[in-house]
Amino acid sequence: MQNGDIITGVDRFPPANTGTQEITVNFPEPMRGAPKVFAMWEDTTITLTYVDKLVITGATSSGFKIATNRLKPSENWWFCYIAIYNR
């Protein structure tokens, strides 16, 4: 793999009211092109009782948008991601 082919990271949804929330995640360095992005909750004990799945939209070389339907307010929900650019 060359530089710009894979980026991994951790980010969080800030505390908010219940309901759908979307944030933009910026990569620490640009990728070569629009990557495939995969994400999962950092805490594997989180179940759908508390939060819904992660939905990724708008992946570009500089970052992506990610949304979730958070059912529990006033907590930080951490997730990890991997972005892979395959030419």
Regions flagged by a language model, labelled:
Residues 1-36, 42-45, 56-87:
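Extracellular receptor-binding modules and their adjoining Ser/Thr/Gly/Asp/Asn-rich linkers
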Residues 51-53:
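Short, surface-exposed beta-strand/strand-loop-strand elements in extracellular ectodomains
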